[in-house]
């Protein structure tokens, strides 16, 4: 009897212990599940990229007027029976005969960013076909023929789109310059796969499950079966730089600066057109069309026939082909070739190519403005990053004279002399002096006494000039030529900018600022010795007894006459001020930023505000004031605005 009672007690105890263990295990499993779900949610939230999807409103009058410059075509697509050509200045619509019908300008109807790709697609979340447009710095824009909408990532690096590929599911594959390959599914924007991040993507071809990804310097990646294979020069690729990819069935063709690599079922086969710089590819039936940099358009038989490629347009303007496209899926349909300077149609009879349309002509030579000035005669001087300069006559701006040679090539600064009428131009190949008529008179370089050939800035100094270079300073006046550099106490040899105020000159360098009185260095300012937030000084101007300094990464700062620094409320943070993109007028201070637009300070209130509407690019590079206007240069064109329109 006692043994039976004890057995029951032990049984009850065992059941209780077992139940407790099961409960404990259940709690642990439940908690583990919660943690796992939380981790997955956190990982998903971290991998997803925040973005804004918005409809672009019709433009308002921003006050900015364009100074016409050449439009560089980048790509084209057919849509609703018309041709749409995308380029640096915007989107241009043409009817079937090549006659212009509408145009949509960047900074007006479109975001202030060059357009780089365009294609037709039906995206997830949309019920109709649209033109899908890739931009250089404003994400993705879609257009249904009447309304534009934008997909703008919060991450600025994800806004620089380099390639787009719509898929059959309605997803959009997006190649970027710094964030690798992204996928947009209509609701979510995220990296395509962890192995394809941090790439500079140049081209996309294939499908979501069998995808070829071209890169700037890492060859080509083949995504298939949930994994990726890489091919570079060691695997048969003629060059690690990839500019074009075309896919048909199991075959893929990868073009670059040294020819075309052919792949079959993911395996390298051979090199076609060796030595040709191939920019774009199109497969038409049994023929591979290759648009090249210098060899026109090549027609290459896909079969192993041994026949040499057929060439078109090796002479004349049919060069530097940006895109080849067909109007339909049939090889007999119309074929188009897009270059920077025009669009060409293939002659169905003779097989050659004829010009169909071209971009609007411009007054200026180039769009990448690096320096501006208005001289005492009212002429506008426009310096370019790599195309010399234009001298624009009169306020009506109807005629421009172009100057470009071995010295007047990369222009950094233009300084007119109001007394003599002469103009000094700082270039990467010397200091070039022009007379009052705008004729080149003299080139001064290292051989003539400068400390370096590369001149970054010029400022008035006594009865002459002070010249900034990456190797230090050179003073040129009636006493002759002499130089200063770090050995003499200059804070850093690499001088970016100069600002003169009476006997004082402030030199902004890569390593801080130096204040000179005459040719004597009176003080140096760095982050270690002052309240300066960044040593890299890119721009400087004298103002109200002190100085304003622009930096590369810490915005603007004011230095008073005693050397005390104050950060600028509203224009500090991580702002990058472009070299010498700082100007003061009687009413305001203007600062040009890298990727953030134009910053304006009202001198009475001291308040800064940003201006982006009406600009052709958010990379503002130069200013000039004259003829009743403020001229604003960017890396994508020049605009002007009456100064009072900038007041708020």
Name each model-derived stretch.
Residues 2-648:
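Carboxylate-rich, polar loop motifs that coordinate divalent cations or form catalytic acidic clusters
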